[in-house]
């Protein structure tokens, strides 16, 4: 069979189905000594060491016990339950606790089917996979749905003046969202019954679309250290901007509450908590309160009915000149709502708020006449118009940045005003779970920004 396989073409191999026959597997242990040691794991034994994403600092190894992971199988079902008919398409790395638990262990425990992609889930690979697999469940990070919304959905409502006018009126906007929602379901294979979103803050504009479109999504909140889920909401219970209430068996409260805002650090008590950080006793000690609650590092507030609202990461928060708490994630959400912005990072440079932006080239070309030609000519260093086009492009991009600066500052409060927009020139450096490595850009800001596109 090996010789025959070697003769097959790549096209034929890709169409082959792999069948594993379990009949006769008992023969493997037939001659094993009865005295062989049985290694039965105990609940408090370490089952996995999974590293944090490393968005704000160096990744830490999180030690999760068998008890912590298995207890997730008791706290998740009241929120959402898999069944044997479910088909899950895995698009996140299994080294991420979110995918490991919700995308593998939990569906396996319910007898669901799981398909794995053999390449990164970029659009050219993901779209065909969705049509082939036709999944009923996907566990995703916000970035993927935000990209779908910005590239596939929002442009359809900006085609002409009539559509823009209709979209600006709430009743017709909801109707347009309903129509677009049906197309989105078809895009995802037509069988989707649960699209889980977690791992980062979800853009409110994209979430508003999903809710009004009737798309079957859910929001989850958790961390690597909590294996991961702490709170969540699905279906009609979803509230835009909230991660939902604490899951069954999980307790959440606020620590170090600011009396003026009612916000504080969210701390958690859960049976799914880590045993500690691998070979890092100091970090482990700092991760818990004196009475044993886990410090999430997230700032937010909890409504009277228990619904959790996250404002941002404690490490990301910027203190303004008069002591104001500034959440860069809120400013970035406004930046990202502009059609020409693909993604952004807000930080401080010499004590002033600045926005580092990755522009959407296609959106820029569609919005500003002549940019497409300038982009092409400015890349051709051997062309006769290289220097002239590059100069014209820089002037045009300065105009774009000024417009974006005005756009943002008209939508944020006075102490969240940004002073400068910097073009990063390319995508931001990210973790395997598509989170921007913020600390990389915060570190660069201390010495004055050098965009990624200019780095050697």
Describe these PLM feature segments.
Residues 70-87, 94-183, 191:
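Conserved AMP-binding/adenylation subdomain of ANL enzymes
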Residues 17-51, 58, 81-87:
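Conserved pre-ATP/AMP-binding loop-to-beta segment of ANL
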Residues 17, 136-139, 148-238, 342:
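Gly/Ser/Thr-rich phosphate-binding loop
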Residues 343, 351, 403-456:
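Conserved C-terminal "lid"/linker of ANL adenylate-forming enzymes
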Residues 273, 307-336, 363-378, 383, ...:
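Adenylate-forming
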Residues 1-27, 36, 351:
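Structural core segment of the AMP-binding/adenylate-forming
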Residues 47-73:
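Conserved AMP-binding A3 loop
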Residues 246, 253, 260-320, 337:
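Conserved ATP-binding/catalytic segment of the ANL
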């Amino acid at each position: 069979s090996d010789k025959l396989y070697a003769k097959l073409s790549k096209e034929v191999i890709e169409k082959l189905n792999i069948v594993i026959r379990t009949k006769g597997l008992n023969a493997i242990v037939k001659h094993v000594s009865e005295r062989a040691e049985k290694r039965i794991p105990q609940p408090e034994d370490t089952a996995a060491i999974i590293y944090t994403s490393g968005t704000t600092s160096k990744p830490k190894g999180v030690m999760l016990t068998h008890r912590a992971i298995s207890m997730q199988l008791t706290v998740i079902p009241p929120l959402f339950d898999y069944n044997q008919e479910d088909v899950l398409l895995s698009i996140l790395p299994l080294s991420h606790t979110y995918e490991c638990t919700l995308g593998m262990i939990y569906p396996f425990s319910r007898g669901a089917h799981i398909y794995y992609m053999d390449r990164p889930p970029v659009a050219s690979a993901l779209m065909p996979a969705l049509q082939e697999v036709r999944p009923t469940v996907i566990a995703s990070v916000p970035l993927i749905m935000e990209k779908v919304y910005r590239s596939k959905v929002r442009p359809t409502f900006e085609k002409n003046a009539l559509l823009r006018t209709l979209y600006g009126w709430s009743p017709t906007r909801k109707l347009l969202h309903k129509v677009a929602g049906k197309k989105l379901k078809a895009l995802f294979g037509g069988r989707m019954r649960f699209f889980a979103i977690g791992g980062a803050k979800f853009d409110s504009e994209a979430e508003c679309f999903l809710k009004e479109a009737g798309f079957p999504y859910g929001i989850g909140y958790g961390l690597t250290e909590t294996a991961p889920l702490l709170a969540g909401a699905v279906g009609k219970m979803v509230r835009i901007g909230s991660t939902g209430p604490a899951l069954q068996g999980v307790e959440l409260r606020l620590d170090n509450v600011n009396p003026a805002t009612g916000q504080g650090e969210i701390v958690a008590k859960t049976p799914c908590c880590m045993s500690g950080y691998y070979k890092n006793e100091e970090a482990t000690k700092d991760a818990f309160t004196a009475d044993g609650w886990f410090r999430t590092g997230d700032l937010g507030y909890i409504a009277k009915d228990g619904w959790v609202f996250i404002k941002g990461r404690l490490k990301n928060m910027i203190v303004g000149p008069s002591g104001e708490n500034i959440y860069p994630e809120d400013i970035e959400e406004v930046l990202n709502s502009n059609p020409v912005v693909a993604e952004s990072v807000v930080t401080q440079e010499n004590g002033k708020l600045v926005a580092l932006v990755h522009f959407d080239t296609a959106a820029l070309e569609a919005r500003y006449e002549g940019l497409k030609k300038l982009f092409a000519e400015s890349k051709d260093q051997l062309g006769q118009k290289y220097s002239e086009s590059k100069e014209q492009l820089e002037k045009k991009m300065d105009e774009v940045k000024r417009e974006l600066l005005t756009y943002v500052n008209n939508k944020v409060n006075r102490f969240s005003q940004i002073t400068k927009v910097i073009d990063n020139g390319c995508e931001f450096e990210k973790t395997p779970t598509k989170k921007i490595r913020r600390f990389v850009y915060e570190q660069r800001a201390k010495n004055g920004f050098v965009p990624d596109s200019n780095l050697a």
